[in-house]
Amino acid sequence: ARNTKGLGDFETVFSFEHLYAAYRASVKGVGWKASTQRYKASALANIDKTHNALLGGTFKSKGFYEFDIVERGKPRHIRSVHISERVVQRCLCDYSLVPMLSRSFIYDNGASLQGKGYDFAVRRVTRFLTKHYRQHGREGYALVFDFSKYFDTAQHAPVFRAIEKSGIDDRLVALSEYFIKCFGDEGLGLGSQVSQIAAIALPNKIDHYIKDVLRMKFYERYMDDGLIISRSKEKLRECLAALRRLCAEHGIKLNEK
């Protein structure tokens, strides 16, 4: 397990060295953008200004760039943050939120953290299907589910509770919640790294209930899509009832189609 010392301390997380590393990571692959080039031209001065604003409690968001994409057949509205804020969010996520929140994630939470992602989820589902076939042949069923308008309707309160219980200090909690509140009273932004980890974490208790309480070994979730494989249709009906109840408790809309 990763040593969590310093991951919950605001000043340690936002050291100049961490901010510089976050800057280097944030500009990879987007160096062609004019806004990125302007930021890079005075990178050290910009990082120093951000560092002082964070430690002085005066850091503010600069708003969003908005555009639309289609991802895995689903239209997505993106509200991308300014490069200076992307550096801060990268630093916050890499050196605090991701390691602190992901400690409690199930292995089969396949969303795009280090070593995970869409290909990981596909490999796991393929493995589940292979193992099920070896054990039961063609006898079995799959419950496929997804969360309706997940990023648009995600409720903040359960996310805030998870962040507050993660072991980080009050200033890190406040900054994390500030970034999420920038998107309004509900919903999470697809162009925000803090929102991404929040979206991954929000159904964590649902994952644990399906895996640990209902003991469904062949369960995989990739962000707002999930799959459960079982020999028993009745067991999957029990899983569906649990999903409906738990989603309602967490402010998540289960797609009933």
Language model segments and positions:
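Non-catalytic, polymerase-adjacent accessory regions of viral genome-replication enzymes
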Residues: A1-D48
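Active-site-proximal segment of RNA-dependent polymerases
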Residues: K5-D9, C93-F145, K149-D152
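Reverse-transcriptase-like RNA-dependent polymerase core
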Residues: S15-H18, A53-K74, V87, D170-C182
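Glycine-/proline-rich flexible loop or hinge segments
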Residues: R24-Q37, I69-R79, I106-D108
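Conserved phosphate/pyrophosphate-binding and hydrolysis machinery centered on Walker-type P-loop NTPases
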Residues: T36, K40-A43, A111, G115, ...
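Conserved pre-motif C helix in the palm subdomain of viral-like polymerases
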Residues: P75-I106, D185-V213
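Conserved polymerase palm-domain catalytic core
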Residues: F128-M223, L227-L246, H250-E256
